[in-house]
């Protein structure tokens, strides 16, 4: 879903429905916080994760340890950056559901995930035309709606968080010739 006209640095509560059927519990744990205005000095704490799409016990242990560390240090996670290979072994819709979204649901319900496509997602998704399960799972800013310059493609995009500008590139299947 695309959501627009939100205030900067604000908390929004949400529910997910499929038609009339509510898919999320009606409670305040389903919320997210928008980014601060570009150029604003603001603390930033984020995770950078890659090659995590196995869906196995070790993946769950790492996620649990990261969450416990945040709680112990009383840190608010502002961003989750994934550098690819979220859905082993072929990046199918089912693999995304089971090995990424289900596994990281406690974090993803409150934290925006900015993702890049890895080679496993590249087996079923193509950056040149933006088609496939990866592009069904993510709506990436291609018109500079999150800061920076328009890329025209979801395969590479940028976004701002306060004074920090992030650039996300698909290094898997796009032609890189000048």
Walk through the language-model features, giving the residues of each:
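Metal-dependent phosphoester/phosphodiester hydrolase catalytic core
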Residues: 1-178
């Amino acid at each position: 879903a695309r959501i627009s006209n939100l205030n900067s640095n604000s908390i929004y509560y949400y529910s997910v429905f499929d038609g009339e059927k509510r898919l999320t519990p009606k409670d305040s744990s389903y919320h997210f916080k928008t980014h601060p205005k570009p150029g604003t000095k603001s603390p930033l704490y984020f995770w950078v994760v890659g090659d995590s799409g196995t869906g196995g016990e070790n993946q769950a242990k790492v996620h649990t340890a990261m969450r416990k560390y945040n709680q112990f240090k009383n840190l608010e996670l502002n961003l989750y950056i994934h550098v690819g290979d979220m859905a082993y072994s072929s990046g199918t819709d089912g693999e995304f559901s089971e090995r990424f979204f289900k596994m990281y649901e406690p974090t993803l319900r409150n934290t925006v995930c900015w993702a890049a496509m890895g080679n496993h997602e590249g087996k079923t998704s193509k950056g040149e035309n933006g088609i496939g399960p990866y592009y069904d799972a993510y709506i990436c800013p291609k018109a500079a709606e999150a800061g920076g310059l328009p890329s025209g493609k979801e395969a590479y995009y940028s976004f701002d968080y306060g004074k920090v500008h992030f650039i996300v590139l698909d290094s898997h299947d796009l032609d890189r010739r000048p």
